[in-house]
Amino acid sequence: MFNINIVREVLINLNLIFMTDPIADYLTRLRNAIQAKHRVVEVPASNLKKEITKILFEKGYILNYKFVEDGPQGTIKVALKYDAVNKVNAIKSLQRVSTPGMRKYTGYKDMPRVINGLGIAILSTSKGVMTDKEAAAEKIGGEVLCYVY
């Protein structure tokens, strides 16, 4: 019998299955790995996913990450961060905001506050992918990709 996850990965890597929202897929893979208490999760790479992963690392939500150049697009290995005592993950919630069917944009004056400033919003701006606080400091708005807290 075939493992359906392995078959799906092979088809995705061969570009035989088209994903309508790769960012939602990325966030879902992270959520599933957190729920299953996995230490490492491997996801197909893209430039946008690399930038989101970099922000998650810089803000302390993940332990480490590594880009692996294998195949046509490569993969990202993300080491999830857990509390040593309680075994609780640093990421409480990953929420996709802007979707391909419903884009959400914000100006720098109307920047969303995630959990009263305790979380972050990740935005795609004209100057690259950055957090809500960085975008407000640069006085630029953009597409709200996701909330993390």
Language model features by range: what are they?
Residues 2-149:
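Core subunits and conserved enzymes of cellular information-processing
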